[in-house]
C-alpha cells in the first residue's frame, strides 16, 4: 500500500520517538526526507542521520535524536503544506516560527532550506513544516 504523505509520516515518526525517549528513528528513505533530516541536523535539532541500503533497491533513513537535560530538543514538529492543500509563499511572506526561535523548512527551486536561508537567497517556495 502506498503512503499518502511520506513527509508527514517522517515527521510523526520523529515526534513519537522523541515523546517516548527513543534514541533513533528509522523510516523509508527518499531524497526529500534526507534533505529535511540534513536541515534538522544543520540546525542542531538532531544529532546524526544515516542512509542504509536494503534489498530490492530500497534504502532506510536512520535519524539519531538529540536530547537536552532529558527532554527532546524538538518540542514542536508540525506539517504545514500537505498533499491536499499545498502552501506556497513568496520571499516576503515566509513565516517566522516562534518569532525566529524556531525554523520553517522550505522547498525552493534552489533546494530544501530553512526560512532564514530562503530569505537570504531571495527565494520563496513550498512551506513543508515548522520546527521549534
Swiss-Prot record:
Record note on quaternary structure: Part of the 30S ribosomal subunit. Contacts proteins S5 and S12.
Function statement: One of the primary rRNA binding proteins, it binds directly to 16S rRNA central domain where it helps coordinate assembly of the platform of the 30S subunit.
Gene: rpsH
One of the record's GO molecular function terms: rRNA binding
HAMAP family: Ribosomal_uS8_B (MF_01302_B)
Keywords: Ribonucleoprotein, Ribosomal protein, RNA-binding, rRNA-binding
GO annotation, biological process: translation
Signal peptide as annotated in the record: none
This protein's GO CC annotations: ribonucleoprotein complex; ribosome
Family: Belongs to the universal ribosomal protein uS8 family.
Cystine pairs: none
InterPro entries: Ribosomal_uS8 (IPR000630), Ribosomal_uS8_CS (IPR047863), Ribosomal_uS8_sf (IPR035987)
Name of the featured protein: Small ribosomal subunit protein uS8
Amino acid at each position: 500500500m502506498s503512503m499518502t504523505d511520506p513527509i508527514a509520516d517522517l515527521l510523526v515518526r520523529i515526534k513519537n520517538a522523541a515523546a517516548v525517549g527513543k534514541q533513533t528513528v528509522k523510516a523509508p528513505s527518499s531524497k526529500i526526507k534526507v534533505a529535511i533530516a540534513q536541515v534538522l541536523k544543520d540546525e542542531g535539532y538532531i544529532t546524526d542521520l544515516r542512509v542504509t541500503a536494503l534489498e530490492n533497491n530500497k534504502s532506510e533513513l536512520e535519524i539519531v535524536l538529540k536530547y537536552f537535560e532529558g527532554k527532546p530538543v524538538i518540542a514542536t514538529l508540525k506539517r504545514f503544506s500537505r498533499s491536499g492543500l499545498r502552501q506556497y509563499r513568496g520571499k516576503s511572506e515566509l513565516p517566522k516560527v516562534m518569532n525566529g526561535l524556531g525554523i520553517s523548512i522550505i522547498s525552493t527551486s534552489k533546494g530544501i532550506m530553512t526560512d532564514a536561508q530562503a530569505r537570504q537567497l531571495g527565494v520563496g517556495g513550498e512551506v513543508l513544516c515548522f520546527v521549534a
